Amino acid sequence: MLHRHGSKQKNFENIAGKVVHDLAGLQLLSNDVQKSAVQSGHQGSNNMRDTSSQGMANKYSVPKKGLPADLSYQLIHNELTLDGNPHLNLASFVNTFTTDQARKLIDENLTKNLADNDEYPQLIELTQRCISMLAQLWHANPDEEPIGCATTGSSEAIMLGGLAMKKRWEHRMKNAGKDASKPNIIMSSACQVALEKFTRYFEVECRLVPVSHRSHHMLDPESLWDYVDENTIGCFVILGTTYTGHLENVEKVADVLSQIEAKHPDWSNTDIPIHADGASGGFIIPFGFEKEHMKAYGMERWGFNHPRVVSMNTSGHKFGLTTPGLGWVLWRDESLLADELRFKLKYLGGVEETFGLNFSRPGFQVVHQYFNFVSLGHSGYRTQFQNSLFVARAFSFELLNSSKLPGCFEIVSSIHESIENDSAPKSVKDYWEHPQAYKPGVPLVAFKLSKKFHEEYPEVPQAILSSLLRGRGWIIPNYPLPKATDGSDEKEVLRVVFRSEMKLDLAQLLIVDIESILTKLIHSYEKVCHHIELASEQTPERKSSFIYEMLLALASPQDDIPTPDEIEKKNKLKETTTRNYRGTC
């Protein structure tokens, strides 16, 4: 994120400092801060923006004299409590849970530099082990030698994968004596922004393929005919879109690429490669779904077991379950990584071969990743992901079968649907007993208010549901679907990511809050409509009272707002049961 040092920061006025300076005799702040502020006032400075004379620093300037470490900690700690609860941040794919043992390892290795392979050889060895483990998880060919590296996340990994494809394309075109100045790359409009960043930063034409409702808001392989040409350096295929969690089909994309190339025997650029973006799916697929499950879904070959997949990335800090700041990128064979992209350094005492966009960086995330592999093993990861998938499917089931709000929700994601007939089961238990019968994907639920709901309550915006849930602590994004050919991108969805810490009890609480808030909105809508009908009969006082009561009701912790009919019945009951017992004077 970019930050500017603008007028707000340059002209920052320390209100608290001014108040304490003027009212030095009053205890307005904690003891240490109060003492610091009063002492600064005795130094004779009249300029409250002069941070060099203040014990309480301007927030945007380095103070001349610092505060005690304990006090500094408390001030910053208190300020950061304003952030949301990470566990209730259901917008994020990034892991927020860490075991005590992992924290201990992190603390012990907090200052190790991953770039310093001579000083920390065992840290480099753990990185090597992780690369080997991932290569096997992604079905590397025993006859090939995969090569890879740790990155700061999938964003950097995507850049490296794209660069490698670009270099190979340039070599092919130049060896054929053809122009190599207009490379392009293919991806669906459901791509994450990092994929588009690659094209802009490294001067590659971005060919975004619009999606549709029919394609489940992911890449339709048949659309590639309109986008692929001899200058196509490769195709990004997303194993788990951030919008809806769908897995784009590597096999079908590869088949269409073969058909296109067969129609153009004159091309010098053949065997157009695929980079599999497994930011989420890179861990979910190998641990969460058996080979036969993926085969039944038509995606038996999704990794290095398909010859067109030359590289793949994943995020360790997502479903690899590490702390933030770790990604991985691998190439199926060393020959796919051009020599000019590699650097051999003798900078820190040893010889190191690197390919990356950064140098010095923490190494503790790699330690955390290796710890997870060792402590969880295949069975531990599988159990966590199966649990997350079950909770996500159960959440979808409850929305679709809500007794309180029947027919008010539509599910846009697909993991709750049967592979055989795209339907949901009659019982939620079927998700637990027969998970292999349902579509693979990332454990998330993308849903929206139904067409039926919008027809009945057209003025109720879906975005307000997201805002009101925030008041309960839940962070759930409301966003438009990706660019589409059928206008479906004009629709918005709410998305809930089911990370490992999102257990069934929390999901049930979320369902209750969604139903409660939406019921309140419906009753508010009905009350407003009733009020409008009677607007000509309303006094100014009654109109004011109505607005106050409506806003108060929305802020109320009570589940329901009474409907106009309920209010009328209540008033009539009050009239018939109220007696005046006041006697004559």
Swiss-Prot record:
Belongs to the group II decarboxylase family. Transmembrane segments: none annotated. The gene is GAD1. Residues 35-56 have a biased composition (Polar residues). One of its GO terms (cellular component) is cytosol. The modification N6-(pyridoxal phosphate)lysine is found at K318. It comes from Saccharomyces cerevisiae (strain ATCC 204508 / S288c) (Baker's yeast). Present with 1200 molecules/cell in log phase SD medium. Residues 35-60 are annotated as: Disordered. Keywords: Decarboxylase, Lyase, Pyridoxal phosphate. GO terms for biological process: cellular response to oxidative stress; glutamate catabolic process. This is Glutamate decarboxylase. Its EC number is 4.1.1.15. It catalyses: L-glutamate + H(+) = 4-aminobutanoate + CO2. GO terms for molecular function: glutamate decarboxylase activity; pyridoxal phosphate binding. InterPro entries: Glutamate_decarboxylase (IPR010107), PyrdxlP-dep_de-COase (IPR002129), PyrdxlP-dep_Trfase (IPR015424), PyrdxlP-dep_Trfase_major (IPR015421).
